Amino acid sequence: MKASEVIANLQRRFPNEPEYIQAVSQVLGTIEEEYNKHPEFEKANLIERLCIPDRIIQFRVSWVDDKGNVQTNMGYRVQHNNAIGPYKGGLRYHKSVNLGILKFLAFEQTFKNSLTTLPMGLSLIHI
């Protein structure tokens, strides 16, 4: 599958995650020409394996606010890629953070870690 096909496929699969799609599109746009020169990359499904997180854990967090009311929020843990080492974690606490943003942050941090030769993958948590 060519890089442009992967992007189109991701847009169909994750239409409500524009931050994630934008990050993947930008990275794939910069490597597409070189990627297309190597049919072995396509045979190994390299781009999809790199772009789609290894796992996403979704969970509920219930808590009591200052007025004594029970609130419920959703939490997410995105374990993006552990190809070069164990998952490295990070936390985000803000009402504006969503799964698409976490996938975007995890995707980009995976590249930062690999480019700086840090022997770790990436995982982010949002509550």
Give a label for each model feature.
Residues 11-17, 43-49, 65, 92, ...:
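Active-site-adjacent core segments of small-molecule enzymes
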Residues 21, 37-44, 117:
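Flexible, glycine/charged-enriched surface loops at secondary-structure junctions
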Residues 111-121:
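Short, flexible active-site-proximal loops enriched in glycine and acidic residues
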Residues 69-110:
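N-terminal cap/recognition module
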Residues 2:
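Glycine-rich phosphate/ribose-binding loops and adjacent secondary-structure elements
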Residues 126-127:
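Conserved small/polar residues in nucleotide/adenosyl-binding loops
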Residues 8, 12-30:
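Ordered core of a single globular domain
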Residues 40-69:
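Structured beta-strand/loop patches that form or line metal/cofactor-binding pockets in enzymes
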